[in-house]
Amino acid sequence: MKTVDLNCDMGESFGAYQLGNDQEILSYITSANVACGFHAGDPATMRKTVQMALKAGVAIGAHPGFADLVGFGRRNMEISPEEAYDLVVYQIGALQAFVRAEGGVMHHVKPHGALYNMAATRPALAESIALAIYKVNPELVLYGLAGSELTRAGEKIGLITAHEVFADRTYQQDGTLTPRSQPNAIISDQQQSLQQVIRMVSDGRVLTQQGVDIPIRADSICIHGDGAHALAFAQSIREALSGAGITIAARFAR
């Protein structure tokens, strides 16, 4: 029987601004990627999100991003491998302290936004991120775009690596996500999203925007908790996976 993880980015509120449906979405996912205060989030939000995730029995991961609150961490920043290393270690450490203070254990790390996408195609950046995670705790799982430079870097250094796919994004022929700036980057039709997800998990294939069918490894599925229909979609995707005989759990092997 196939097993797949359902993950969601959360803890993105800060100050007076409230984002997402964190409390509600926790009922449907198996792992949570918590913003660490750079692209979103703040100390109070980090603490509260960790508390909610622990209560729900959801695996907790750090979601480090660029220091770009205005751009929500989605704008490319040209940084050196050393700067990327420091950025990731710092943010992992911040969230890990909150997890430990609440009596929990951190499970994984998933880079955010532009940092994630850049690391998918840039070996030096990917290796610096993987090294940062490994040096902090070699038992942490690295979540990265399926088949990317980031997952390769994680595997090379000896990390448990989860190849991630996206429920609501389209793919390019090289296995990367269609940039949000391009047409048809987001799948708005729920049935199309569900069909894509089931096929990626069951068959290990995805149809790209170029009309070419490519292989893909799906260890974890990213869903988003901030859309108008996020909760209904989260419920639908769980039902679809269960209906296809797929176990939903945050379990990964080397």
From Swiss-Prot:
InterPro entries: Glyco_hydro/deAcase_b/a-brl (IPR011330), LamB/YcsF/PxpA-like (IPR005501). It comes from Brevibacillus brevis (strain 47 / JCM 6285 / NBRC 100599). Its EC number is 3.5.2.9. HAMAP family: PxpA. GO terms for molecular function: 5-oxoprolinase (ATP-hydrolyzing) activity; ATP binding. Keywords: ATP-binding, Hydrolase, Nucleotide-binding. It catalyses: 5-oxo-L-proline + ATP + 2 H2O = L-glutamate + ADP + phosphate + H(+). The gene is pxpA. One of its GO terms (biological process) is carbohydrate metabolic process. Forms a complex composed of PxpA, PxpB and PxpC. Belongs to the LamB/PxpA family. This is 5-oxoprolinase subunit A. Catalyzes the cleavage of 5-oxoproline to form L-glutamate coupled to the hydrolysis of ATP to ADP and inorganic phosphate. The keyword Nuclease does not apply.
